[in-house]
Amino acid sequence: MNTKIYKRVFALAGELMLAAQERNQINFDNCYSELKQLCDDNENTDKDHPVQWETLADFTDDLPLAISIYEKALLKAEEINSKDFRSSIGFSVASLQVELGEKEQAIENL
């Protein structure tokens, strides 16, 4: 993964956590929008990587939307044959599916 992009994703994740802890919705929305734009700009380029999509999904409040973003991240992890990312993303999807009462689908993702 491009180091500059990784550092920006990491910084945005920290800013998103801080905004969430401070209940600062404006800062949260701004950081989320920037992260989403970064993902969109890099999609299907050599800078595309599952970590940016997984991070975006981590901060997505709408659970079905978060699952769809995780699924995109999972496809990207499969493309680079990353077992670590596939495991992490699969666990996140399964956790959300349990929250949504979709236990059978959750088991399939583990």
Regions found by a protein language model. Name each.
Residues 1-4, 41-44, 81:
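Structural signature of alpha-solenoid helical repeat scaffolds
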Residues 8, 12-15, 50-53, 90:
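TPR repeat positional signature
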Residues 22-34, 60-71:
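Helix-turn-helix repeat elements of alpha-solenoid scaffolds
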Residues 36-40, 74-78:
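Amphipathic alpha-helical segments of tetratricopeptide repeats
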Residues 8, 27, 44, 48, ...:
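Structural signature of alpha-solenoid helical repeat junctions
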